[in-house]
Amino acid sequence: MALSPILVPLLLIPIFLGSVSAISPLKTDTLKPGQQLRDWEQLISAGEAFTLRFFTPRESSTFLLGSGAGLRYICIWSQTDPVWVGNPTEPVSDSSGSLSIDTNGALKITRANASPIMVSPHLSLAGNVSATLLDSGNFVIRDAGRGGGGGPGRILWQSFDHPTNILLPGMKIGFNLKTKKEISVTSWTSNQVPTPGAFRLGLDPSGANQLLVWRHGEIYWSSGILTNNGSSQLALELSRRYNIDYEFKFHSDKRMNYFSYSVKKTKGSVSSSWFLDTLGQITVTTSFRSNTCAGGTSESSGPCKKYLKSSSAICIAEKPTACRKGTEYFEPRRGYMMDNAYYGDGLSSGISDCHGSCWRNCSCIAFQSLPRGRCQYWGKGSTFVPYDNFNGGLVLIVYVLDSEK
């Protein structure tokens, strides 16, 4: 069931906490055959808008491998957040990883005592290849011998064709009719674990000019019909607030059907990102900077905001059940539950799956999303105990049904 869009201001923008080793820039935006981007190094785009480097999410360093260790991912970063992950399902287990490109155009991460991790495939095109990080946030593989005219070369592969959980200006989501491949944005399992989660943002396959969010293959949210250029509600609102031209583009030809967007400001620089979070919400963040001022806005879309009585409540829409109307909600609480705990069977895709399982069980009143795709639940008769003094700075968040607090 497609649900109408709801736009509400956010006071908090998601923060991706992680540990990053001491970083040494390579003083370049390009990686060539024979060069390596080692664990402690980074590429910097020409205008210093984006960097490419390894990092360890906090959750993996805290829970998965023990204190002082962690899983390493190759990521493109904006000023504050990762916007693309090259190896979301196959991290490096230590700091031995290094990124390189071979003469056939294959990006790969080599590591100690394990086979290489392929970031891009072999393109079977020997030539003058290189990989460059652009100021758009796109990481492109080019063959200079095929560009002609002394230009930078034809693009053979680009990270924009393989988005993770963020849509940047110029990225295209839709359908490649030639390769029969769909390009979409997929949520992470958690804010610190980049493996694919429960939600996916893409273009409506029916041909309508609208965006859909799916939850495990079922339509969860719809943007409603959008228009090209800047005449859509969201585009007009952002333009009015910050004097920014915000435009949507729907395009269809024999090769590809896609949606993309762009932003620009008359004076100064502007950046934007659409973030699909672990709850299936889209947070649209736009910021600008000039010689005299800086500012920004953040808007989120979600199907359940109108039901929530608390700004901190978890927003995941569920279908009504025999015991729940669909307007109840779980709220995060710092502390722990007493008695009647049990664990779910099998692995989950993060907090959304834990939420759904607890929702469908009429005796479940609280849950917790654990590392490694596990869920813990508490049944009726359990008691919540507030507590805020966890050792080592660990904060235990339990999601408690509003009627049970």
Region annotations inferred by a language model:
Residues 2-405:
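Beta-rich ligand-binding surfaces for carbohydrates and other polyanions
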